[in-house]
Regions:
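Conserved pre-ATP/AMP-binding loop-to-beta segment of ANL
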Residues: 17, 152-171, 177-178, 212-221
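AMP-binding/adenylate-forming catalytic core of the ANL superfamily
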Residues: 87, 93-96, 104-106, 262-265, ...
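Gly/Ser/Thr-rich phosphate-binding loop
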Residues: 147, 174, 242-245, 269-274, ...
Length: 541
């Protein structure tokens, strides 16, 4: 038995069958029930021509079905593909096609979008619709109802042997603004991103230890606040399923701090996983409300992945949760979990500071690891258990996954310094990526959407500081002669091209866009305009 995620979670289910695994609204399922339903779904998929190596899209809100679909894919050596439910039709088509989806499990609400996209994806041959609180007609997408499909499957675990080399793909934003699929081997993902399935102990040396740990360790109840379509929440869920914990999912489509704190009290949540200030600030403010009477006594850890806390928000939360430990983790889709923040950040530190192991380094211009304490800025890199590359993108793979001086490194573009004590200070992305509430937004895609408006001659998009979201999207626009452009008009137009969180919240009109001699936008100039000019502004991400 290798370190395969399906094998490991099945072994945990056998070790603690009657233990609750997932809570979602009024639905509570044990490990045995979760495994049985995933097994039934896996057999249904096999019976309908979906099997080893096929890609299964999960176009779902947070739900038990999301986890069932993930586990079912693992069982048959297929690959679950996360789909951002905020995508509009053009973005969905790109992802469906780029990911070579053979099947899609979607919420009923999304049937019209699936109907619009599916005919343009030649290899897509199975659609399953999960019931929700809408009355959308699933016949428009020719989808099969999910529950009868699951019920029809066998409960036998008579699947083909699996491998630690089975594939897991996580789609994330690309440098051109389009999503790209990060390919991980199961075994590498387990140790690089999922803490070996033992978040508060040593990683396992044998596969059997995962179930042993799950049975013997204390049960930890975890609440991943972010959507499961994001790696931060998906990995949190897998970590605690592997460790025999209990996962609490929020049963709403929108971020609701009041509901989250009520769930914390009702389910005695121990660990909360969030995405930086975008979630941390509203959660802190909810606790600070006059008359707030939430029971947070069970919480002993609050973690942030995908975006770090600011010191101010961390202090707000600490004041309300004095007995909790606050953990920023750094890494990402390409790097996994590379380290955790130091307890106290020095006041003069130019960025958040983290502890890391020997697999993480800061590389100089010659791609050699910098020694501690030089004060030099370099590229954050990781070696060892890292992804295979990007799916169907050898060019970007070659740029991000590099061979240098006998080592293979993943270099995602973060700039950093290695301090005298060996800790890592993160300085930010070397690219122009905008991080709004943990969502990666790439200017080129939004610029293309803006330029497709009849009144826009040219446009540059940058991120500007935002107290809640970390950054918000600002557009610097040159209108066509005789034309005018308003924020409201561009907002409505962009929403037909890109997801809502990518739409500019500020508009700065200029006589002419400044570009470099190469023709590339001058982002430094654009940031100065966006930071110094009066803005027509809207809300956050």
């Amino acid at each position: 038995m290798e370190f395969n995620l399906a094998d490991l979670i099945e072994s945990v289910s056998d070790a603690v069958p009657e233990r609750e695994a997932v809570i979602y609204g009024d639905h509570r399922v044990t490990y045995a029930q979760l495994d049985e339903r995933a097994t039934r779904l896996a057999h249904y998929l096999l019976a309908n021509g979906i099997g080893e190596g096929d890609h299964i899209g999960l176009y779902l809100y947070n739900s038990i079905a999301y986890l069932e679909g993930t586990l079912a894919a693992f069982k048959i050596r297929a690959v679950p593909i996360n789909i951002n439910y905020r995508y509009v039709e053009e973005e969905l088509h790109y992802l469906f096609d780029n990911a070579d989806l053979a099947a899609v499990i979607h919420h009923r609400e999304f049937a019209p979008r699936v109907a619009a996209v599916a005919p343009r994806v030649p290899g897509l041959r199975l659609l399953l619709a999960v019931d929700d609180d809408t009355d959308a007609d699933i016949s428009v997408s020719r989808s099969t109802a999910y529950e009868p499909a699951v019920a029809s499957g066998s409960t036998a675990r008579d699947f083909a042997p699996r491998s630690g080399g089975d594939l897991y793909i996580l789609y994330t934003g690309g440098t051109t603004g389009m999503p790209k699929g990060v390919m991980w081997r199961h075994e590498d993902l387990l140790f690089a991103a999922l803490m070996g399935g033992n978040p508060y102990g040593a990683p396992p040396e044998r596969p059997e230890q995962v179930a042993e740990n799950a049975k013997n360790n204390a049960v930890i109840t975890a609440l991943p606040v972010a959507p499961l379509m994001h790696g931060a929440a998906q990995w949190t869920a897998l970590i605690y399923l592997l460790s025999g914990g209990k996962i609490v999912l929020t049963p709403t489509k929108r971020f609701d701090p009041d509901l989250i704190w009520r769930l914390v009290g009702q389910e005695k949540v121990n660990v909360i996983s969030i995405v930086g200030d975008a979630m941390g600030r509203p959660l802190a403010e909810a606790l600070e409300q006059p008359g707030a009477s939430y029971d947070t006594s069970s919480v002993f850890a609050v973690g942030s992945g995908g975006a770090t806390y600011s010191e101010g928000v961390k202090a707000q939360l600490k004041a309300q949760l004095p007995n909790a430990v606050f953990l920023d983790s750094f890494g990402g889709s390409e790097g996994g979990n590379q380290g955790r923040s130091v307890p106290e950040r020095p006041p003069d530190s130019p960025g958040p500071r983290f502890n890391a192991d020997e697999t993480t380094a800061v590389l100089d211009d010659d791609l050699k690891p910098l020694p501690p304490g030089t004060g030099k800025v370099g590229l954050l890199a990781r070696k060892g258990r890292i992804p295979l590359g990007y799916y169907k993108d050898p060019e970007k793979t070659a740029k991000t996954f590099i061979e240098a001086h006998g080592e293979r490194w993943v270099v995602a573009g973060d700039m950093a310094m290695i301090e005298a004590d060996g800790t890592i200070t993160l300085l930010g992305r070397g690219s122009n990526c905008i991080n709004s509430g943990g969502e990666k937004i790439f200017p080129e895609e939004v610029e293309a959407a803006l330029r497709s408006h009849l009144a826009v001659f040219d446009a540059v998009v940058v991120g500007v500081p935002d107290t809640r979201w970390g950054e918000r999207v600002a557009a610097v626009v040159q209108a066509r002669p005789g034309q005018t452009a308003t924020l409201e008009e561009l907002d409505a137009h962009c929403r037909t091209k890109v997801a809502g969180y990518k739409v500019p919240r500020e508009l700065h009109l200029v006589d002419e866009i400044v570009r470099q001699p190469s023709g590339k936008p001058d982002y430094t100039w654009a940031k100065e305009i966006a930071s110094g000019a009066a803005a027509a502004s809207g809300g956050g991400a």
